[in-house]
A protein has these predicted regions:
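Secondary-structure boundary/capping signal
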Residues: 12-13, 43, 80, 99
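Non-globular targeting/processing and membrane-anchoring segments
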Residues: 85-227
């Protein structure tokens, strides 16, 4: 999106983002502003906390792209993280319809890194996994989760693929698990090029200190960006 916004700005393309939160922490404007700055997003981003934009487009998934022509008509929409070449070709066609000239026929090749890198779907055998009890699946610690209560868990010794567990004292609520005593541990057996974990401090402006082990050792060159 950033590349398209820069490449086609002078040809008349206007990019507007809409952030529709999935979790409660995503409703906070400060969190969204921090993410926008961190990702160096320069086009405007609307915070759609009440899902008005989502519902008006009858949207069904994150992310989604909608291309609107100069007359305000939706001419193309796409769900998911793929087919970027096709989307860009439609952008070019709509700009030409509106009188743009001199557009290159090639599409943008972006070699993004870190959290912006395109997913490797050919080797991604692990789905999005939720820690909160509302959507959690494949919990492998032997203890049964008591909702919204502090309890001590035992980490699974050899979890199956896409199974996970906790160790030490946690309070598992609908959307997250809150560590009660330090240290604690999350164990997850996954198969994917990338693993992203959402962490947040109990108090604002406090850093979250954590250690990542991959197959019991430091990840070394496989260490991610930490953003």
């Amino acid at each position: 999106m950033k590349s398209w916004a820069a490449k086609y700005k002078d040809a008349g393309l206007v990019v507007i983002g809409a952030h529709t939160p999935e979790f409660s922490f995503e409703h906070e404007p400060m969190n969204v502003e921090t993410a926008v700055r961190s990702l160096k997003v320069t086009f405007p981003v609307a915070l759609d906390s009440d899902y008005r934009i989502w519902r008006s487009f009858d949207n069904q998934a994150w992310p989604a792209q909608y291309l609107v022509d100069a007359k305000g008509r939706i001419r193309y929409h796409h769900l998911g993280e793929s087919d970027y070449g096709e989307i860009e070709r439609v952008i070019q066609e709509l700009l030409k319809e509106n009188g743009a000239t001199g557009l290159a026929s090639d599409t943008t090749g972006v070699s993004a890194v870190g959290i912006e890198a395109a997913p490797d779907w050919t080797d991604a055998l692990s789905p999005e996994t939720y820690i909160g009890y509302r959507q959690a699946l494949n919990f492998a610690s032997p203890e049964r989760v008591h909702k919204d209560s502090i309890q001590v868990f035992t980490a699974p010794a050899k979890p199956s693929l896409n199974h996970w567990g906790l160790r030490e004292s946690w309070n598992v609520n609908a959307e997250s698990a809150l560590l009660q005593t330090v240290p604690g541990k999350i164990v997850f057996r996954f198969h994917s090029r990338d693993l992203h974990l959402v962490l947040a401090p109990a108090k604002e402006a406090k850093p979250v200190r954590f250690v990542v082990r991959l197959d019991g050792a430091a990840p070394g060159e496989n260490c991610g960006s930490g953003q």
